[in-house]
A protein has these predicted regions:
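Metal-dependent enolase-superfamily TIM-barrel catalytic cores that perform enediolate-based chemistry
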Residues: 1-81
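Hydrophobic faces of well-ordered beta-strands that scaffold small-molecule active sites
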Residues: 1-5, 31-37, 60-63, 83-87, ...
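Short loop or secondary-structure boundary microenvironments that flank
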Residues: 9, 39, 109, 131-132
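Structural alpha-beta junctions
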Residues: 27-31, 56-58, 122-127, 148-154
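Anion (oxyanion) recognition and catalysis
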Residues: 77-78, 121-123
Length: 182
């Protein structure tokens, strides 16, 4: 099981540090933890969390700890602790080719999903399939890609945000219903 924790970007938040300790105290050994500050940390704060979590075996990664344009800082951190890129990949698509750690990939933003399908079947791929705001048709592709990735050479729990999808014909899982709504 994988737990994702969205954290704040406040520079001095001792409450979050206490929550982290509580999470680590109760998190079963088989669980994985992902921490997501949405690019809101300074290098100093990211380094503090890195120092705290460096030897934590349940940490899967910290997702986009620094602003998307702090590429140098992200590479420095990635040499110390697992870092997954998210917003940086949207702003700087060339990073998809050179970032060797995990990448949060949103097929609806990536373009042709067949290219991502080929990519996730490679042994050196560290893509994590995630959602944006898709219609029912896009959601079907995402579910297909996520299922392939989970069974692939580098399996990883996808970020599918279950239960967020609005109701209505555009978000229906049957393409015919979506098409008729359009």
């Amino acid at each position: 099981c994988t737990i994702k924790w969205k954290v704040s970007n406040q520079e001095n938040n001792s409450k979050e540090e206490k929550v982290l300790q509580k999470i680590l105290d109760i998190l079963p050994k088989k669980f994985k933890l992902r921490i997501d500050p949405n690019g809101g940390w300074s290098r100093q704060k990211a380094q503090e969390w890195s120092n705290e979590l460096r030897d934590e075996p349940r940490l899967e990664w910290i997702e986009q700890p620094l602003p998307s344009n702090d590429i140098e800082g992200l590479f420095v951190l990635a040499n110390q602790i697992p870092i997954a890129l998210d917003e940086s990949l949207v702003e700087f698509p060339h990073l998809k080719k050179i970032w060797k750690s995990w990448q949060i990939r949103r097929p609806a933003l990536d373009g042709d999903p067949r290219l991502l399908l080929k990519e996730i079947e490679r042994e050196d791929c560290h893509a994590v399939i995630s959602t944006a705001f898709e219609t029912g048709i896009g959601r079907r592709w995402i579910n297909h890609l996520a299922a392939r990735q989970v069974k692939g050479k580098n399996p990883c729990a996808p970020g599918l945000a279950p239960g967020w999808c609005p109701e209505g014909a555009l978000f229906h899982s049957n393409p015919k219903v979506v098409w008729e709504a359009v």
